[in-house]
Structures are given as C-alpha cells and as structure tokens.
Amino acid sequence: MWSLPASEGESATAHFFLGAGDEGLGTRGLGMRPEESDSELLEDEEDEVPPEPQIIVGICAMTKKSKSKPMTQILERLCRFDYLTVIILGEDVILNEPVENWPSCHCLISFHSKGFPLDKAVAYSKLRNPFLINDLAMQYYIQDRREVYRILQEEGIDLPRYAVLNRDPARPEECNLIEGEDQVEVNGAVFPKPFVEKPVSAEDHNVYIYYPSSAGGGSQRLFRKIGSRSSVYSPESSVRKTGSYIYEEFMPTDGTDVKVYTVGPDYAHAEARKSPALDGKVERDSEGKEIRYPVMLTAMEKLVARKVCVAFKQTVCGFDLLRANGHSFVCDVNGFSFVKNSMKYYDDCAKILGNTIMRELAPQFQIPWSIPMEAEDIPIVPTTSGTMMELRCVIAIIRHGDRTPKQKMKMEVTHPRFFSLFEKHGGYKTGKLKLKRPEQLQEVLDITRLLLAELEKEPGGEIEEKTGKLEQLKSVLEMYGHFSGINRKVQLTYYPHGVKASNEGQDTQREALAPSLLLVLKWGGELTPAGRVQAEELGRAFRCMYPGGQGDYAGFPGCGLLRLHSTFRHDLKIYASDEGRVQMTAAAFAKGLLALEGELTPILVQMVKSANMNGLLDSDGDSLSSCQHRVKARLHHILQQDAPFGPEDYNQLAPTGSTSLLSSMAVIQNPVKVCDQVFDLIENLTHQIRERMQDPKSVDLQLYHSETLELMLQRWSKLERDFRQKSGRYDISKIPDIYDCVKYDVQHNGSLGLQGTAELLRLSKALADVVIPQEYGISREEKLEIAVGFCLPLLRKILLDLQRTHEDESVNKLHPLYSRGVLSPGRHVRTRLYFTSESHVHSLLSVFRYGGLLDETKDTQWQRALAYLSAISELNYMTQIVIMLYEDNTRDPLSEERFHVELHFSPGVKGVEEEGSAPTGCGFRPASSENEERKADQGSVEDLCPGKASDEPDRALQTSPLPSEGPGLPKRSPLIRNRKAGSMEVLSETSSSRPGGHRLFSSSRPPTEMKQSGLGSQCTGLFSTTVLGGSSSAPNLQDYARSQGKKLPPASLKHRDELLFVPAVKRFSVSFAKHPTNGFEGCSMVPTIYPLETLHNALSLRQVSEFLSRVCQRHTEAQAQASAALFDSMHSNQASDSPFSPPRTLHSPTLQLQQRSEKPPWYSSGPSSTVSSAGPSSPTAVDGNCPFGFSDQPSVSSHVTEEYQGLGLLQEAPGSGAQEPPLEGQQEPFEQNQSPQEPPVETKKPCQEVAEEVSQPCQDIPEEVNQPCQQVSDICQPCEENHDDVDQTCQEVPQISQPCEDASQLYQKVSKEVCELCQNSEEVNQPCQGVPVEIGRLVHGFPVGVGGLAQEVLGEVGRPTQEIPEELSQSCQEFSVDIGRLAQEASAINLLSPDTPEVDNPPLEFPGEGALQAQEVSEWVKQQQSYVVPELIDQLSREEVPQVQCPPSNANPQSQSLAPDQNAPLPPATCDSSFSH
C-alpha cells in the first residue's frame, strides 16, 4: 500500500514511497499532486500549508511508449514526490502542434522511437531549455550504428572487431567488398566466418549471422520478435549486395545475451535471455512474456554501464552485452528503455529519477545522493536441512555418435602440381598439410582430373598402377556433387627421400631418393541421422543428473538443469575435437541437454568450443608412438599364425586376463582360418551387390543416408582388395574397418536382405574385439603408456576441472533477490563435456583401470567394477565416462571428507548382438542415504538381493539381472554420504513424505515434444535400473514410465524396493523410428544407449587428484629420461648463434611496436576446421614442429605463478630459467640445468591451464581510472594468439587515474608478492603433488610473439624465476586466499591496458597452441578477490587469511634487479573497492 503524505514538519524534503505491487496504483491520476487524491483525514493540515511550487516533468514520446506498462508504473511512483508533477504530451500535440504551443516544463523526458519527430523535440528544448533526462542531440547518433560504434570506441569501451561497408556513390573508397567461400574482406579487413552483418540503421533489426562451411554453412537471420520466433535459419551463405552494413566478428556467447538497463551512471539492472541466434525460438512464460533472468553484473560491467550512460548522455539507457570467453563486449546501444515486469526496478528507477530531478532543480533541499542498495549486498543464502551433499561438478568424456564407415586411401605423388599445391598452403613449414575446405579440395580435384587426362594420352607401366588410385581420388572428391567440408579431407606429408616402400608387395629393393608426397585421402565417417538422435536423446537424459527446480520448468523431467542453466548458475562448457562427426555430436547433445530447437549449425557455432589446437581431444593418428608400433607388430605376428590358439598365445595376447578378450579368442581359435572365412564372406557380399546392381528394380535404390549400391560396392571392393595382400597374408589393420562396415549395413541396410552378413558380423566382431582394444597395448604397462600418451592433456584438464571447486566472482550469477526457494543460489554446478573419438575413450578408461586408482584386493566395489569393465567387449558410439564431484558443506573445508567423487561409465549404444550377452554392472548408484532409521523395505543398496527380483516376475523385466554378489555388497563406508542435495534444489512437501523421498514431477513431457523427437524413449536409458535405491540423483522412474506410455500399478509406489524393479526404463529398446531422416524404407534402427553404471561412489577428491597427478608425473618423468640424451647431443652441437641459450643470459633485440590489430585480443588465430572461434580452452602438448617458443614474460608470469600455486600445480624444478624462443619448426630441447623430470612435450601446458584462471585478476578495481600506461609493449598478444582467456586481462581492466610513467616497478611489486607467498608455503597436504611444473617454463611460458616485451621494460629477464624459493609446494585450499592481494595491485592493470600495441598474428596455419584454456581458469581467480565477494569471507576466514593490506607506494628494494630504470615513481594503488563519483 502507498504511505500517507508526510506531516508538515517532514515536508521540507521530497519523499518517495515504495509500493508493493500493482494493487492500488490506479486510483491516482497521473500529473496530480499526491495530496489531491489522498484521504480526507489530512485535509485540515493541508489547508494550513500554502501551496508548494511544483517541478513539472514533461513526458514527450509516442503514445505507445508513454502509456506502456513500465512507463506507467514508473510515473505513478514518480508522482509520489511531493514537489514533482508529471504531464504527458499527447501524440497529437507532438505531431501536429508547433513547439511554441507545447506545454512548458522544467524537466523533459523525451526519446526517439519510430515516427517520433526528434527535430521538434530538439527545437522545443532550445526554446524552453528544460533539464533533459536523456540528451536529445545524442539520439541522432543512437539511430546510426556507425556513430554508436565510433562513440564506443572513443570512450574505450570494448566492442567486437568491426568494419563498415558504406555503399555511397560519393565515397567509393568505403565500398570495397571481396567475398570468399568462408570469409569476407571489407575495406582490407578480413572477417572469417562466423561473422555478423548489421544494417547501419539502428531501426533495422534484420541482422544476419553467417556460418562457415565446416559447420554446415548457411546463415541465421535475426528480426524483431514475431510471435514465438526471433530468428530463422537459412541455407543462403552469401552476404547482402544492397545497402550499407557493419561487419563484425561473431562473439561466442554460449547461447545467452545480457541486456543492461541503466538509470543514471551508478545504477544498472541486467537481465539474461536466450540468444535469438541460437535457435530462434522465444522462450515465454505462462503469461506469454519472454523469459528473462535478472543477473548480477561484474564490477567491470558496471563500469562499462557507467561509461555508456555518460558517453551517450542518456540517463535511462539500455544496451546489449555479449559475454564471450569471460570478457564483456558492447554490441548495441538502444537508448531509452525500461525493464519489463520488475517491481524492484520500477521502485529504484523512480527513486533515482526523482532524486536526480530534485538535486538539479531544487538544490536548496540538499537531497543526499543515494542509490538503492544493491541486492547482492543482501546475503540471502538459505541453508539446507540435514547433511545434504551438493553437486558441484560434472565431467563427462563422450564418444561421438553413429557414423558412416570411415574410409582411407594412401598414394605416393611426385607430380610438380602437387608440390606447388603443398607450397601454396604452407605445407613446408611443418612438413604436413591438411586440406578440408571446399576450395582446397577443388584444387586437388582439378589436379587429379588433369593427371588422368595426361595418363590417357600417355599410358605407362608403373603409372598404370597409380591410375586406379587417381580414379578413386577423383570419384571420391566428386561423390556428392559438392563439398560440404566435413566429410572429406586430404592430407599431404612431405618425404625428402621418398615414401618408404611398404611391406605390401612393393619392390623393397628400389631406393627412392627423390622427394615425394604421401597423399592420404579420408572420407566417410559422417554422423548419421541415427547418431544425431542418439546424441540428442543422451543430452535429454543427462538433464536428469542435475538438481531439480521448484515446480516444472517446462512440464517435463530434467527441468532442473534447464532452470539452472537459464539462471546462469550452470557453468557449462562443451568441447569437441576437430572432426565433423564429433562436433555435430556435441551440438546435437547440447540441443537435447538445453531443450533447443532447429538446426545444429547455430548451436554448434555458439555452444561447442573447439579443442583441436593442442591435442586435448585430437590425436595425430599418423604419428604412432614407438610403443604402439611394437604392439601392432606383435599383434600382427600372433594373428598371422595358422594354428589354434595355445596357452602361450593366450599369455602373449591376453596377459591382463580380460574376460571379453578370452571369450573372443575362444570364438576365433585359429585366426588365419577365421580371416579366410571373413575374406570369403566379403567376396560373396560384393558378388551379391553386383548382382543386385544388374537388377532393374534396384537401379534407383537409395540406401541409408543417401548411399547408393554403387558406393556400397566401392566400399566393400576396397576392403576386399586391401584385406588380403599380394603375399597372401592378411592385413590385420583392416579388421576394424570390416567390422565397422558390416555393423553399419546390418543396422541401417538390413532391408537389402544380403546373405551371410550375420555370420560376417559375428566373425569380424570376434576379431575386432581382439584387435581394437589390443592396439592400445597388450600388457598393463603398454596399455598405460599408450593411454597416457593419447590423453595426457585431457587428464591434466580433468585434474584442473576437479580442483577448481571455489566460486568465481565474475561468472554469471543469478540475482540473490530473485532466487528465493533455490538451493544455495550463489553456487554453481560446473559441467565440462568433452566429445572425442574412440582412441581417447579407450585411453582414459585404461588409465582408470590400470593406473592404480584403487587396490582391487582391498576394495570390493572397485573389484566388481573392474570385472564389469573386463567383460565389456566394445566401447561403442556414445560411450560415456562420467565423473561427478559433490561437496558436503557441513565438513571442514580442508578435510578429506569435504569433497566426494563418483565414477560412472556406460559402454555406449546397444550393439547389434543379442541382448542377453550384455554384461551387467552394479547399476547407477550415487552414494545412498545414511538414514539411521532406514528399513530393509526402503530399498537401500545393501539390502537388495536376487530373491526380491523373483518375487516380482512381471515387473522385473530387466535385461541385466541383479549381480549375484548382491547380498555381499560391502557395508557403507564412511565416505558414502547422505543423499545428494544435488538431486533436487527444493524438496516439495509431498515428496518428503513419500518413502525414499523421490520427487515426482507433476507432469511428464508434453506429447508435442515427443512427436518432434520421433522416439519412444524420451529421457530413458541414462541410468541403469539395476540399483536405484537411495539415489535421488537418478531420474524419477514414474516419469519414465509415463513417457513410455506405461501405467505403474498403485501398489508399486508403496515400497521403494519394488519401485526398483519396474520396467520403466526400456534399457535396450530399439526404435523403428518413423523419423523422416531414418533412411531406407523407414526401417533404420536407432539403438538405445546402455545406462550409466556406477564404477565407484566412495572416492575422495584427494584420492582422485593424487591418482591423476601421479599418472601425469610418471609419464613426464619417463619422457624426460628418454629425451635427456637427445638434449645432451643437441646442446653440445649448438653453434654460438644457436637460438637455445642457457638461462639467465637472454638478450634479444627490442621488439618493434606494431599497430593495434583489428582483431580483439581474445581472438585466436583461427580454428583449422572447426567452426567455433569460441575460444578453445584447454592445456596443450607441444607439437614437435610447434612454431611457437616460450619467451620471457615476467609481467604476466607473476600472476601465473600465483595462480599455479593456488591450483596446487606448482612444483619445484631446480635450475629453471628463461629460454629464448626456438626457431620455427624446431623442437625445443632441454637446457643444461633443467630438471630431467620435465619433458619438452608438456612445457606450455601449465601456462595454458592457468591462463583460464588468470583472466580477471583485475576485474573489480575501482573505476577512477582514466589513463592507461602507454609504454608497455605488447601484452595483449598472448591473448590474441593463444589465450582467449587472458583476454580479460587485456581488456577488462579499468584504466588508472594517474599515468604510470614506468611499468618497471609493477614487476617489483608482483615479484615481491610471489616471493612472500612462496615463502609462506608450509607443509600442507597436496592433492596435486604429482604435476611437476618447471618453474622457468611456467614463468616464461608464453608464445613467441610476446618475447620482446621483456626488453621493453626489463633489463634482465631471467630473474623472476631465481627468486622463487626452492620448496615450493602449496595446497589448493590454503593458497586460494592470496590471490586477493594481487587483485588489489591496481597498478598491475596498467600493463594490460587495451591501448597497448600488439605484435603480428602468427600464420593462420598454426592456430594458437595455447589458445585453449581460456574461459575456465578465469573463473577460479575471480572468486578469490575477497573484498568484492562478501560471501567468500566466511570461507576464507576458515583458512586463516592474512589481513589484506594496501601495497606500499614505494618499490620493494629487494626486487630492484628486475627493473632497468628505478627513477620513475609509481602512484600507490588504491584499495578502495567502491565506486567514487
């Protein structure tokens, strides 16, 4: 209710009354004094008071705007000020009356919209000279995007890199457009796709986003919302040819936009909404309004809001922010706009406007300057009842979905045209070249056609043999009539002395001395429609692992994740390797996970990050390790013996005793005989296909995924030729391809009815089940060595993901005021999804199986898990390894019981073998309830026994019976904690009374959505139903049953144990999908996916961290020993001018300053074939031919070193120092005094892993910062080349108010801090002690492009490393505190000013190796800034934080050796974290 007017004594100041809602607002007319319509009770008092002079506030806008709900709400509140009277100029007056006749006013709120005569408003303001809330002259500029961008640039506000194309006949020099296949060049500036095309008029909302051909091409066309759509996907890929446009870099925002609404320079309200570019569907609530979520702005973003407000002189102003790679860019300024449907905003806005007007026009009242208290200052953190555990992190490694068979052909080429092609695309720099883009493949096709034409004229002996391969090359490249860029690639490798003669019957005596190229053509391997469906379904099922929301978000299970994601409390990053099928799987998964609609291309570009630059998820299949070569040779030798397997063969081939391996060998018995049978069956198959092709009925027959009989015949004929060599021996490496092909045809082309395919499948599967897993190592030691070689970067990344459990200040947070009824609104669930190929999944599983995670002799649960894994014969498509991290907030933060890890696994899609042969696991079983009063009939894991299953025969229709060791399950270990709070945010009252506390959704998924997916099982299949007792993380079975159209008998809910045996999850149902995409005669099968099985649910974070660290350390030590001899020889042979100098003697010429690049600093040099310039972010292994070296970078290194200690990853390595960058194409050997533990391979990795966390050390520095230090050379470049994440350090920095004469003292301060922090490191248990990081490399581990920076500001660069104490070991938790101190070094920011110049980009062929770790590391640092994040103080106090002090203004004398010039004084950094005005 509104308050009554103030008494006479109080009327000396203007008053503002806060309202509770809409009720009661309509009783008072606008423009009326508050007293005129108040109760008569106060009439007598009013009669005694003479009438007060009024300040008249005029509203001059179109009726649609001035009578809108937000405006009405705000004006009603504005009228509550005693001295303000509001008048609204009618539209008729504005349009038709001369300005002289307009009513006069003291204050004018006027803004432009469609049809508004801005000229008349300007004339009126000149005539009456009112106080303008929003400047009118600036509104002309806001209507032109070119002017908006110009002003933003002048104000130093970050915006995407852009160029303007003016199609103006008077200025032809501004209209230079060159359009390519995957880029445009605008007036000399090149924009690779994806890029954005915006009309220059701000009133034109037809913005187009163009996608690269590698992602599927086409464009997304955005427009003003029409009904439920805000954009539509179009296959058109060429830009518009009429009109003037702004072209700008596409910002990968993970599918969300932030809209900011300012009211004056000190108040900003922000809301997040789904990006219209994602799928174009507008999410609306029950009242039909677009769903938006209020989010909290970071300190940097508040500073941006202030700058925008002041620069455009618009008190009330809306603008759009893009949060990309942890940094914020302004992409649009809309001028006057209000928040819709936020009572708090209406209250705040009216109060600020009223106060602003009164202070300006009635200064005698001396109204204090106060802005409404920010909601984030109110610590609303509801506690949970009981000891619930909270889901904090989900890490999943997932293999791609069902694909077409992969095919490969190799040929040696020596024609000069191939060499010139190789040279043209820069192949000589690395000796290798990968061609995937359509124009590149077209060049290869042109050369092939030319050579074939020449061969027809001059047929020759040896050339005849090549003719067949050239024909095949031509036919594959011509296959679809166009190049999609995803399904074919050509690789060329340079051999200076010719390709070595292979063992396939070629003349080994011929000695080839002339240089040649090995051409490898790869095709096939595309994701099938079935694969897309599998990925989307798995994404949908994955939702059910996350906390549930209060009420149903969209009326179907899994709503918890959607609510979590929409409110920005879900920190999701999806990574995919280089391959198209992997990227499309990731996009389809994201589509299901986040309930998106439409095409995969926009989802792929915005949601999927590319991790292809550094081996995180890719592996160079052409360069096998020596261990792999040995293993393959031994495998081939054993399988070439024409005799039954004997005991010795079993020992040689299956030393691990794997159950699946032994059973496959039992099927094979004599490998050569089985290969003979397989070869005969393939011959028979090709014969049948040829016959079928002669049949007139089959002429136009279309097989699955648009394949023809001719293409199918090509596929099998090639295998027939290659499998049996000229010598009569069999090429064992073709067995996986044969199995691949026959599995594909049985599943997708079964309607052809070809004879013998079932037997071929049985035999080839038996062979493949031996060959495929054994290619990754035969003995345990080999398996582990090969596994770590494949996935060392991924292991380190997982280690980082697990250890970064603290909160991040700048991650998008839901406004606490709007999160009542939400469990711990300030917390986040971090999800990291890694989509990759078979090799990484095999390798990662080998690490867990053979790396010594647990002692199986002492841990029966792990013993059972290993037995289950041993029985798995194939890691099929969509195999998942899932790691879930829980936190128990009731435990001491440093105790081992604080964090709890679970390991789950699924072997992927159901194979084509009989269902009964599937191995059974122990079910999906997160740690179950520890309720003391639990009864046996509550279905706890320990009390399940096979007997119960037989009591319910009609409901126990599971394909996998309960494990026989059911009664022998171990009693609960102390680590199996209480039921996870992660399972639901808020338990409804009804659910808590039900046995087991399962939350039942009020309704299942609407039938419309089921129809869209075309599948019967909606969320099914993620979890094994063998055991679900006590698992509130598991999805609700009743919902599954409902989605299957089944009815649970009422009795089934009486006891939880009975619920376990309901056949709600059809584990292996095969959908004969009536999907239009599902291929041949609608009968293609989409197999369901095996549910997740729990391998272990009682691990501590410390156990897992130490295990991963140990594995990584063992590998690096082994590599170091192997490369020590190599280093010695290389070092002794160095010439005096060798690029490899000993540490501490580095002197290289000063780097010349370059002009600032047009690319934003986060811009990496471009993914090779992925779409997502969305910054990759992951650690890297240094390629042998890596063009980047590790130059000295002291300024950033101090940050990095601190971050590393905080992560617990920094270990002492003796004698570390600075290295000079290696020459291009050379690998960097060890320095003499380097630790033998550190191999060259992983040198850059630590640096990159940290780069993510370094992103925003300076985010919350006070805003009175105006003069950046201009003398520092190129620090922005590391971001541009390699770290999307360091981009924040370059850009998000407020500018310092006093110019910094010399940056040298900053180095002193930072190194002093490093020294102090290092010296404080006491003995603390280290969860990550196994990751040795050579400090010299860490400190100087930035790319070559930054090398000269050291010389600009530093005389001697080797020093920072020397100052680091020897015993450097610090645990994650204890060190997390000290980052705050660094954050307060405001001076540190000067070095990272946006105005600093940059060095040139590296060539495009070398995408930034270090680029990948960007976004996530920043998250960890931000939360360490304790003075900005009040909710962290509690946590930090438990860790005995030293009091944070302002740094002294004088330089530390101990660090003077770092700076060449000690004379320039450095102003003290301010520690005041508030904005001052």
Curated annotation (Swiss-Prot):
Residues 37-47 have a biased composition (Acidic residues). Residues 1001-1016, 1446-1460 have a biased composition (Polar residues). It is found in: Cytoplasm, Cytosol; Cell membrane. Transmembrane segments: none annotated. Its EC number is 2.7.4.24. The keyword Membrane applies. Residues 27-47, 910-1016, 1131-1248, 1438-1477 are annotated as: Disordered. Keywords: ATP-binding, Cell membrane, Cytoplasm, Kinase, Membrane, Nucleotide-binding, Phosphoprotein, Transferase. This is Inositol hexakisphosphate and diphosphoinositol-pentakisphosphate kinase 1. Belongs to the histidine acid phosphatase family. VIP1 subfamily. Bifunctional inositol kinase that acts in concert with the IP6K kinases IP6K1, IP6K2 and IP6K3 to synthesize the diphosphate group-containing inositol pyrophosphates diphosphoinositol pentakisphosphate, PP-InsP5, and bis-diphosphoinositol tetrakisphosphate, (PP)2-InsP4. PP-InsP5 and (PP)2-InsP4, also respectively called InsP7 and InsP8, regulate a variety of cellular processes, including apoptosis, vesicle trafficking, cytoskeletal dynamics, exocytosis, insulin signaling and neutrophil activation. One of its GO terms (molecular function) is inositol hexakisphosphate 1-kinase activity. Pfam families: His_Phos_2, PPIP5K2_N. Substrate binds at K64, K65, R224, K225, K259, R273, S337, F338, V339, K340. GO terms for biological process: inositol metabolic process; inositol phosphate biosynthetic process. The keyword Translocase does not apply. Its main location: cytoplasm. ATP binds at residues 145, 198, 205, 224, 248-251, 257-259, 275, 320, 332-334. InterPro entries: Acid_Pase_AS, His_Pase_clade-2, His_Pase_VIP1, His_PPase_superfam, VIP1_N. It comes from Bos taurus (Bovine). Coiled coil: none annotated. Residues 1164-1182 have a biased composition (Low complexity). The C-terminal acid phosphatase-like domain binds PtdIns(3,4,5)P3 and InsP6. Despite its similarity with the phosphatase domain of histidine acid phosphatases, it has no phosphatase activity. One of its GO terms (cellular component) is plasma membrane.
